[in-house]
């Protein structure tokens, strides 16, 4: 199997990593000469794929499938209009993506489908989340605690040309789930838990997520951290499945999407949906359940129906990012990986099972995604923390304590 990946940042890194785990050859096309995914791909073509149709066709038809890993509307539309005509499976649903790329359009869809969601301002009261309709991840997100902060955040976004979404702030654990769908059938995959840095960017993904057997769910830290084995109450994961499936079918999705929710009580409230390959969570799913989402997506497109899957957790996994800079070592959101150089896959990196990193001995500034697995989430977290300490000692870096923030309701997988 040979996969053409268009885009070499966060989503491209995810695609290249999981394609390699499936034993596939990868060809990366990116306009830049040193994107993060370039270090993981078998071949890197530096090009704007839309600039030369003959060359693009040659690249696409030399591969068994094309997976867009970017969010440039022009590029996506160009590929969607051509790749299927060239007879190559196109692992992307442009119509569904266009709906989910707008948070305002998504909220209208949630209302039509009667999907639980945060209340719109002012019904939800304060604090409230103010965010741009079309930005990705944590970009532009503000938690406003009074009307002065709210109006300032709204004014700043409007001045930058954004349509603005203002909705209820929902405290509680943040969960994510991917769904494969095709031809009116949909299959939910493994649920993951998300934790955030001070800028509301996802710094850590944990799998699996469990329900409390009895009594109240585990308390949630200000950064979204909790005992993920008992993160939510009974019935919440089933309700999340139901909401995710309703959205996939409502979108008439032929492909992959991820759904992010906050759980502030007995039901999950859907924050946003993205009809494309996300970053971060698929690797955590792979390490916990063994499900390779890129491989499953290609199989879904090939046979025209999502395959049956066993999403039972085989082990726990923790996936987190660190940055070394100025003599400090910090656990931070995934933005530090988007600005990294070409990444290498390093097994056993300072005690982690694997790392994706642009680290080199003696280099003063670098970033890494650390991946650890264990029998339980508590043991996986312990190992992840031990890895960070090992890095700090070996590299003579000062570890920065993780800053707890208001439990964000944005900034999950990109």
Where do the model's predicted regions map?
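ATP-binding N-terminal substructure of ATP-dependent carboxylate-amine bond-forming enzymes
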Residues: 1-93, 363, 375-376, 382-403, ...
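Short beta-strand-to-turn element immediately C-terminal to the catalytic PLP-Schiff-base lysine
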Residues: 141-146, 180-182, 207-208, 372
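Peripheral (often C-terminal) accessory segments that flank ATP-dependent C-N-forming ligase machineries
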Residues: 298-414
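Phosphate-binding core of ATP-grasp and ATP-grasp-like enzymes
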Residues: 157-163, 170-229, 238-268, 274-282, ...
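Active-site regions of enzymes building and remodeling cell-envelope glycoconjugates
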Residues: 39-48, 129-130, 340-347
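Hydrophobic anchor at the start of a short beta-strand
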Residues: 26-29, 117, 128, 164
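A conserved helix-loop-beta module that forms one wall/lid of the active-site cleft
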Residues: 84-148, 152
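Glycine-rich phosphate/pyrophosphate-binding beta-alpha loops
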Residues: 135-138, 274-289
């Amino acid at each position: 199997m040979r996969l053409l990946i268009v885009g070499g940042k966060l989503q491209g890194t995810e695609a290249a990593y999981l394609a390699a785990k499936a034993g596939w050859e990868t060809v990366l096309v990116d306009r830049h000469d040193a994107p993060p995914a370039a270090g993981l791909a078998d071949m890197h073509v530096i090009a704007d794929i839309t600039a030369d149709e003959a060359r693009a066709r040659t690249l696409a038809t030399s591969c068994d499938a094309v997976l867009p890993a970017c969010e440039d509307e022009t590029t996506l539309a160009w590929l969607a209009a051509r790749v299927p005509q060239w007879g190559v499976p196109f692992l992307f649903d442009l119509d569904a993506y266009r709906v989910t790329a707008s948070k305002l359009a998504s909220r209208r869809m949630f209302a039509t489908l009667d999907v639980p969601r945060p209340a719109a301002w002012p019904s939800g009261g304060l604090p409230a989340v103010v965010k741009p309709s079309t930005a990705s991840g944590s970009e532009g997100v503000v938690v406003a605690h009074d009307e002065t902060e709210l109006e300032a955040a709204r004014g700043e976004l409007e001045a930058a040309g954004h349509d603005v979404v203002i909705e209820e702030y929902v405290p509680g654990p943040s969960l994510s789930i991917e769904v494969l769908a095709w031809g009116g059938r949909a299959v939910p995959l493994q649920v993951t838990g998300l934790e955030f840095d001070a800028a509301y960017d996802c710094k850590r993904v944990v799998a699996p997520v469990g329900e409390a057997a009895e009594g109240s769910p585990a308390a949630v830290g200000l950064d979204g951290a909790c005992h993920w084995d008992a993160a939510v109450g009974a019935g919440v994961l089933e309700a999340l499945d139901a909401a995710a499936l309703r959205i996939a079918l409502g979108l008439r999705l032929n492909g992959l999407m991820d759904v992010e929710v906050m759980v502030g009580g007995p039901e999950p409230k859907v924050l946003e949906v993205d009809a494309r390959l996300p970053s971060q969570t698929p690797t955590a799913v792979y390490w916990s359940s063994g499900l390779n989402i890129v491989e499953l997506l290609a199989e879904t497109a090939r046979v025209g129906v999502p395959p049956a899957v066993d999403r039972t957790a085989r082990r726990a996994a923790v996936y987190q990012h660190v940055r070394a800079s100025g003599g400090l070592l910090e656990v931070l959101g995934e933005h530090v990986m988007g600005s990294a150089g070409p990444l290498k896959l390093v097994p056993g990196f300072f005690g982690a099972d694997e790392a994706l990193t642009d680290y080199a001995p003696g280099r003063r500034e670098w970033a890494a995604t650390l991946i650890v697995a264990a029998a339980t989430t508590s043991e996986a977290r312990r190992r992840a923390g031990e890895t960070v300490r090992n890095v700090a000692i070996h590299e003579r870096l000062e570890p920065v304590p993780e800053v707890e923030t208001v439990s964000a309701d944005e900034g999950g997988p990109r």
